[in-house]
């Protein structure tokens, strides 16, 4: 009820202004009696995945807390894991505004943010100060002005800087809002990137005395053959997990709705079916050799269960969380 009232107010604002205000409020409320508005005690539903123990299988997807400013608030909501980022080596402003749009009738969002963030060093400082009990994922990307042929260097820089502080590292090569980025999902480009990341992981594991798993985040807009090739690369390079999926460029489900023609990636309920299908195809190809984190359109316990039945060991929410609030996390965890 409280969240429904708050949402009514937030939805009167421009989508990005509402997001920024929410982040500020989470920072302001953290550690004060006001955090009772979102703090909740959830039952333990432990899951072993990628060599880590998650207190429950419901995580926050990357993109909501790009700079790691609200880890403690999301931890207090009971998430089993929180993924911050996407973060890049250098700060960047992202694409021009407006760049975030609600499709309220479809419970969807279109964004063309463009990896706006304050840089990896800023994020690391925030993580170092935060106190939390959930698993922390850090999602890394490349700067917009880094040529795609040099993209691996950006991922390696970020990986080196976040390694010590991450529970796992998510490699984002599937955002539709950085020109050319999705080309890294295919063929030799993917193989070379994963090989370099794996070598860096071995080097950093020895240096820090701990193994931090790597998960690749992929797009929903892939053919069956492309999914098969990605699976082959993941197994060949001993990557630890795969996150499926990012946002979609497809507008079929929302055609004719307000904002449907805005450029960017579509998330929320309209991507639910396709992302679940990608999870299913990944599971068919990978079996139990590699864990899958399912994300895309999870707005209820039923939607989360569908992802798990398709083969996901963990799930993440973002757009569903915007529309339904912390109660969504509670409902999923309690019903598992």
UniProtKB/Swiss-Prot annotation:
GO terms for biological process: 'de novo' pyrimidine nucleobase biosynthetic process; 'de novo' UMP biosynthetic process. Its cofactor is FMN. It is a peripheral membrane protein. One of its GO terms (molecular function) is dihydroorotate dehydrogenase (quinone) activity. The gene is pyrD. Binds 1 FMN per subunit. This is Dihydroorotate dehydrogenase (quinone). Keywords: Cell membrane, Flavoprotein, FMN, Membrane, Oxidoreductase, Pyrimidine biosynthesis. HAMAP family: DHO_dh_type2. Pathway: Pyrimidine metabolism; UMP biosynthesis via de novo pathway; orotate from (S)-dihydroorotate (quinone route): step 1/1. It is an enzyme of class 1 (oxidoreductase). Substrate binds at residues 66, 111-115, 172, 177, 246-247. Catalyzes the conversion of dihydroorotate to orotate with quinone as electron acceptor. It catalyses: (S)-dihydroorotate + a quinone = orotate + a quinol. Pfam families: DHO_dh. Monomer. Its EC number is 1.3.5.2. The active site is at 175 (nucleophile). SUPFAM superfamilies: FMN-linked oxidoreductases. Belongs to the dihydroorotate dehydrogenase family. Type 2 subfamily. FMN binds at residues 62-66, 86, 139, 172, 217, 245, 268, 297, 318-319. GO terms for cellular component: cytoplasm; plasma membrane. It is found in: Cell membrane.
């Amino acid at each position: 009820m409280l969240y429904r009232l708050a949402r009514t107010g937030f939805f009167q604002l421009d989508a990005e202004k509402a997001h920024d205000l929410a982040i500020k409020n989470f920072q302001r409320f953290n550690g004060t009696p006001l955090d009772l508005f979102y703090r909740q005690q959830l039952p333990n539903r432990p899951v072993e995945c990628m060599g880590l123990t998650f207190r429950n299988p419901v995580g926050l997807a990357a993109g909501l807390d790009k700079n790691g400013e609200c880890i403690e608030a999301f931890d207090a909501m009971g998430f089993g894991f929180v993924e911050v980022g996407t973060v890049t080596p250098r700060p960047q402003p992202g694409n021009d505004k407006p760049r975030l749009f609600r499709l309220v009738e479809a419970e969807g969002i279109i964004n063309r943010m463009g990896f706006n963030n304050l840089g990896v060093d800023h994020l690391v400082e925030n993580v170092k100060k935060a106190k939390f009990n959930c698993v922390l994922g850090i999602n890394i990307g490349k700067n917009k002005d880094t040529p795609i042929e040099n993209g691996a260097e950006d991922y390696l820089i970020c990986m080196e800087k976040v390694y010590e502080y991450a529970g796992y590292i998510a490699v984002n090569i599937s955002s539709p809002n950085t020109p050319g980025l999705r080309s890294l999902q295919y063929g030799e480009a993917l193989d070379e990137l994963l090989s370099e990341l794996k070598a860096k992981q071995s080097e950093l594991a020895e240096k820090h005395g701990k193994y931090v798993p790597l998960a690749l985040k992929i797009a929903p807009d892939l053919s069956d053959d492309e999914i098969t090739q990605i699976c082959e690369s993941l197994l060949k390079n001993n990557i630890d997990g795969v996150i499926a999926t990012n946002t979609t460029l497809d507008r079929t489900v929302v055609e004719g709705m307000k904002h449907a023609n805005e450029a960017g990636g579509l998330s929320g309920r309209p991507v639910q079916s396709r992302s679940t299908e990608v999870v299913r195809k990944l599971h068919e190809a990978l079996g139990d050799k590699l864990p899958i984190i399912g994300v895309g359109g999870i707005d209820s316990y039923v939607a989360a269960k569908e992802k798990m039945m398709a083969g996901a060991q963990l799930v993440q929410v973002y757009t569903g969380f915007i529309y339904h609030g912390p109660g969504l996390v509670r409902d999923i965890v309690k019903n598992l």
